[in-house]
Amino acid sequence: MAAFTLWILVLNVFLLGFQARKLASNLKFPIQKCDDSTPQKNFNSFLWLVKRTPPAYFYGTIHVPYTRVWDFIPMNSKQAFTASQHVYFELDLTDEKTMRALMKCQMLPSGTMLRQTLPRKMFKRLKSHLRYIKRMIPKWIKHRDQETSSAGPYANKLYEMLTKDWDKKRPIWVMLMVNSLTESDIKTRGIPVLDQYLALEASRNHKLIGAVENVDEQCKPLNALNASQVVFALNQSLHFQERLRRGQVQVTYTTDDLIDHYNCGDLKSVLFSTQTSLPTLTVNSSLEQRERKRAQEIDQYFRNELIFQRNKRMAQRVITLLNNHPEKDFFFAFGAGHFLGNHSIIDIMKKHGYDVEYVKPEQELPSFKAKKSLNTRRERRKGCRGRRKKSKRCQKKKKRKRPDYSRVRLLQVATRRWNPTRKPYPTKLSEAPGARDISSRKAAASCTPIWTVSLALTCAVTCLLTYSGFR
């Protein structure tokens, strides 16, 4: 999940939790519906061109199922993605280490449970809300499975997957989980979001995938909130969800509205209208004044840490990539909010002297024939044949040290069991001594051959030596 999306969720919790009805009147934007017959020029483009040879592109993504927006993305945006061989995201969502690190950063310290960090009443309210979600999931996914019997087991598995280890997670991540357990999000669960779909397509087409951030840089701002701020945010989130269940409040601006704005409307007016300031409270009680002040402090913190500071960091790393690799083309796919408003990545790039141009939906892209990707093994082997053998890259490959297998052989000798007859160890049940007897056969089958253990140990040491610099 992109950190910008997390910030939008957090801010929306405060907005809706304080005065949902007043917010409804402030968010009445004209939404233009798009269909297949809509002309290409009316589609909204989130593509920017960095004028250089070869070209580099910025593309603004949105964290929704790609099937809802892919057909409305202008053709020149898709062509820019197809033509680029180096695709960079905020995080590399195709990397298993990245996904494991994301899960790890959400967890509380070892031995600490969520009930120990929350007030008792709030923890009971949270459990009650999760039980409600578990009861509602089978009804929400009825359109997938017509038979109730098949929907039940799937619903239970889906609930367990969405709420896995929730009682061991940090409260801020539990709050984000609660806000994502909505009917519309659960119905589309399993469909890759747009940025994830682009990463999968880049991997399938053997493009070189990279990231401009690491997991710690996205997790630390969220985990750095103090306990009182997190409890306050989770309380506001639960309060809104409880009022929503009782029918006391309605969501006036939904994900569908955001998708319509992304496809053919003005996303800038939507994103930044909800980021300007918190709505003014009409009731001047001391409690609400304290809540408003605390919400504004959290709002300012997230605005600075998750938007402005990240824009600076990502823009600087983009500039480093462009300077260090002038011969390569690039396609940078970040959250759309990072390219809009003041102090955006586009503004920072222009301040550093780069000519960045907004690309309209029907605008032609600069002609450039990208070099063939060298991402596959077969293509990498072909790269050092013929005249290319004298290149610096190929010479470096020759200088690499081969693994020192003598240490592995010594280890094999040291772990080998003494065998005076020098006969090979039985590898088949029929060759084992006493195999004629049924009980002996079972005993021979249950005994692990010594060569299996030795082989596993040898493989482990080989990997250790190989990745420790013995090349």
Curated annotation (Swiss-Prot):
Highest taxon in the source lineage: Eukaryota
InterPro entries the record matches: TIKI1/2-like (IPR040230), TraB/PrgY/GumN_fam (IPR002816)
Membrane-topology annotation of the record: Single-pass type I membrane protein
Pfam assignment, any one: TraB_PrgY_gumN
Main location per the UniProt record: membrane
GO biological process per UniProt: negative regulation of Wnt signaling pathway; proteolysis
Biased composition (Basic residues): 369-402
Protein name (database record): Metalloprotease TIKI homolog
Species assigned in the record: Nematostella vectensis (Starlet sea anemone)
